[in-house]
Regions:
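Flexible cytoplasmic loops linking transmembrane helices in multi-pass membrane transporters
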Residues: 1-3, 192-273, 281, 374, ...
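Central mid-sequence intracellular linker of multi-pass
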Residues: 130-143, 162-246, 410, 415-416, ...
Length: 508
């Protein structure tokens, strides 16, 4: 799956760049009045509306897109998302008025909807959900890196200003869009199909016969071992509207949505507010670098101790709160920037942890439709936080956006309160899961609900309680000192060798 991981990273990197380059376009070639706002004669309110319209359509179409992906070939649907996103992104190069910009932003949110939750769903086809956190975190870094790269590359596009009669930002929209269109076709060869059970033959419908064949992610004994590991948690079966309604009525969905709402809103708010601090002091250390470091450190730990996800999420959110308070009340510019770095460090792992916890909870409880619907709803409804920060807070709150020592102070304090709601939701989720558990739906087949097959899974199943200090210390002690002594590891090694030997005998 390593080369396929690169494919997911690249597609998310490029689509994130297409989504966010409107922010760079507002500052390109300002001295010549060839920036986006000057060319289209936009007001700050027009900017806030255009940014918010993206999230409105994203919220509306996130769930339908992910449900379609669960019914169709996932690699084809993911390639469709990239193609449509790139096509709309290319159209930004021809924008001539404010209303057309707003329309394209709405269309962009509509066509890109389902990409982020779709990647989380795609991962559950190949990995147990309890081990997807670090992989989701790795893909999430693509968005962070693209934000930095778009800013750096924009210098080159500014030099192309007036070349061929196009402004620099139009060249930027055009080239990013065309590169994305090329990538969308390459994904048909690059991304893997759904994994098959050993011995199963892939049948293709007539209307998909023209598509290129993608190599299987795993073959031979590796595929057999992988299938035995995955079948304990992966529940593929046809779903109906009634199944979807059961997912929507599951109380576990709503604490996760509130968790996502707060951290995503803070992420967007940090981008808006952070630019004010960065412009004032011109630092050399990047908040994005701190963000990446946190993802690399925390998300693997949240997978290893997946029953402690509430702890990891809450700790990261507390760091964000501390950072917001520092950057709000500190007087010195560098002190305020250090607070911004704290927000970046806390923000990095929270979104991947939230998505991984959603996949883990709803895969076991509702199967494939649970993952598809829950990840889309958490991502979609959670992005209402983005609408809040772009339209109601920061630049969308004129009195709070006035220049002065207290600029954006009220918006920051509102975000502190929203983060408190996210932390409370995580703790409520952990407590209620402790009280009521997460039993599988009675509709899931019993033969896929067997005991864990491998040593890692056995260790996961016997993790101590996540809500006690003893549980935390025991988990850490086992990880540092006794991981190789786990007898279940020897059992699974023996079982895997036996299965591999049996497979060789059958071939002979």
């Amino acid at each position: 799956m390593a080369d396929h991981d690169v494919a997911f990273w690249c597609l998310y990197f490029l689509c994130s760049a297409i989504r966010s380059n409107i922010g760079i376009a507002q500052t390109m070639n300002v001295s010549d009045r060839h920036d986006l706002m000057s060319v289209l004669h936009m007001t700050p309110k027009d900017t806030s509306t255009a940014l918010a319209l993206f999230y409105v359509s994203y919220v509306i179409f996130d769930l339908p897109s992910n449900l379609v992906m669960s019914r169709l070939n996932p690699r084809v649907w993911m390639a469709r998302i990239v193609f449509a996103t790139s096509l709309v992104g290319t159209c930004f190069a021809a924008v001539q008025s404010v209303w057309s910009l707003k329309l394209l932003r709405f269309l962009l949110g509509m066509v890109i909807a389902g990409m982020w939750p779709g990647m989380a769903y795609y991962l559950t086809l190949f990995y147990p959900p309890s081990r997807t956190g670090k992989r989701i975190g790795m893909y999430f870094t693509a968005s962070q890196v693209s934000a930095a790269v778009v800013g750096l590359v924009s210098a080159g596009f500014q030099l192309m200003d007036s070349l061929g009669g196009l402004t620099g930002f139009r060249w930027m929209f055009l080239i990013y869009g065309l590169v994305g269109i090329v990538l969308s076709f390459a994904l048909l060869w690059w991304l893997p199909d759904r994994p098959l059970a050993p011995g199963q033959v892939r049948h293709r419908s007539k209307w998909l016969s023209w598509l290129p064949h993608s190599p299987e992610a795993l073959t031979g004994d590796d595929a057999t071992v992988h299938y035995q590991d995955l079948r304990r948690v992966y529940h593929p079966r046809p779903w109906t509207i009634r199944d979807l309604v059961e997912v929507l009525l599951d109380w576990r969905l709503w604490p996760l949505t509130l968790m996502y709402f707060g951290v995503v809103g803070v992420g967007i708010g940090t981008q808006l507010y952070g630019s004010v601090i960065i412009a004032a002091i011109q630092p050399t250390a990047s908040a994005i670098t701190i963000d990446l470091i946190a993802i690399i450190i925390v998300t693997p730990l949240s997978d290893r101790f997946h029953r402690l996800r509430a702890f990891f999420f809450s700790a990261a959110a507390c760091i964000q709160i501390a950072g917001l308070l520092v950057t709000t009340f500190a007087v010195n510019g560098w002190a305020r920037y250090s607070g911004l770095l704290m927000v970046g460090f806390g923000l990095g792992p929270t979104v991947p942890i939230c998505m991984a916890w959603t996949s883990e909870t709803f895969q076991r409880r509702h199967g494939e439709v649970g993952v598809a619907a829950a990840t889309a709803l958490v991502s979609g409804l959670g992005n209402l936080g983005s609408i809040t920060t772009t339209y109601a807070l920061y630049a969308g709150w004129p009195e709070d956006a006035m220049k002065g020592p207290h600029r954006f102070r009220k918006s920051n304090l509102v975000m502190v309160g929203i983060l408190g709601l996210s932390i409370a939701s995580a703790l409520v989720m952990a407590v209620l899961l402790r009280m009521f558990g997460n039993p599988p739906s009675t509709k899931l087949d019993n033969d896929v609900l067997n005991e864990p097959e491998d040593g890692a899974a056995r260790r996961e199943a016997h993790q101590p309680s996540s809500l006690t200090l003893r549980g935390i210390m025991t988990n850490l002690f086992n990880s540092l000192g006794h991981q190789q002594e786990d007898p279940s590891f020897a059992i699974v090694s023996s079982n895997r060798l036996s299965r591999a030997a049996a497979a060789r005998r059958r071939r002979e």
